[in-house]
C-alpha cells in the first residue's frame, strides 16, 4: 500500500515546466449536510482546481469540478454533484482524453459503508463503489489516480485497484466512519 501511495504522490507532485495537455482532473465535492462541511468541501475543491491549473499547469478546460452548489462560483464549477452529472463527466472525459492521458479523480466529502457497499454521498442518489468501478474501467489504457478523502473509503482499495490505477484513500478500513481531514492535507501538499 505504501508503494502505491508513494507512486501516486510522485506522479502527481512532479511540477511540470510546460502545460500538461494530456492530464485531466475530475474533482467532486459531495453533499455536505451542513454549512460547516459545505464551506470546508468548497475550500478544498476550489483550491485543488487552482493548484492543478497554476502549479501543475493542467489547462482549465481539462479540469471538471462538480459541487453541491454550483452557484458558489459559476465560472469555476462545471456542474452539480449528482450521479447523473458524475456519469456525464466521466463520459465526457473518456471521449476527450487521449490514449496516453492521465486522470486524477478527487472525491471530497462524505462516504458511507453499510457492511455490503461503499457509497459516495452525492446530491440525490449516491454513487456506489460498483458504479465508480464501472466509470473508471472506461479509462482502461490510461493512467488513473483516484483519491478519496471520504470516511469509509478504505474499501475502495479492494474494489477499484488494478494495473495502471492508483487508489489513495483517507481511511485504511471501510469501517472508519469519522469525518476525515485528509483532503485538506492532500491539497496543501501541492501548494507547498
Label each region the model flagged.
Residues 40-47, 51, 81, 85-92, ...:
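Extracytoplasmic/secreted proteins, especially bacterial periplasmic and envelope-associated proteins
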Residues 16-104, 111-113, 118-119, 145:
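Boundary/activation segment at the start of structured domains
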Residues 126, 136-147, 161:
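Active-site histidine-anchored catalytic micro-motif
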Residues 31-35, 69-73, 109-114, 125-128, ...:
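Solvent-exposed loop/turn segments at secondary-structure junctions
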Amino acid at each position: 500500500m505504501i508503494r502505491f501511495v508513494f507512486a501516486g504522490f510522485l506522479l502527481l507532485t512532479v511540477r511540470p515546466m510546460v502545460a500538461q495537455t494530456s492530464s485531466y482532473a475530475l474533482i467532486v465535492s459531495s453533499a455536505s449536510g451542513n454549512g460547516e462541511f459545505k464551506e470546508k468541501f468548497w475550500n478544498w475543491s476550489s483550491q485543488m482546481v487552482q493548484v492543478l491549473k497554476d502549479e501543475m499547469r493542467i489547462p482549465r478546460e481539462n479540469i471538471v469540478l462538480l459541487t453541491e452548489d454550483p452557484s458558489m462560483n459559476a465560472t469555476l464549477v462545471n456542474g452539480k454533484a449528482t450521479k447523473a452529472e458524475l456519469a456525464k463527466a466521466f463520459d465526457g472525459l473518456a471521449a476527450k482524453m487521449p490514449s496516453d492521458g492521465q486522470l486524477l479523480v478527487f472525491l471530497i466529502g462524505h462516504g458511507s459503508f453499510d457492511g455490503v457497499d461503499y457509497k459516495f454521498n452525492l446530491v440525490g442518489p449516491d454513487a456506489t463503489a460498483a458504479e465508480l468501478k464501472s466509470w473508471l474501467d472506461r479509462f482502461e489504457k490510461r493512467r488513473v489516480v483516484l483519491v478519496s478523502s471520504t470516511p469509509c473509503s478504505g474499501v475502495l482499495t479492494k474494489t477499484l485497484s488494478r494495473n495502471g490505477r492508483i487508489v489513495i484513500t483517507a481511511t485504511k478500513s471501510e469501517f472508519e466512519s469519522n469525518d476525515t481531514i485528509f483532503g485538506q492535507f492532500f491539497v496543501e501538499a501541492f501548494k507547498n
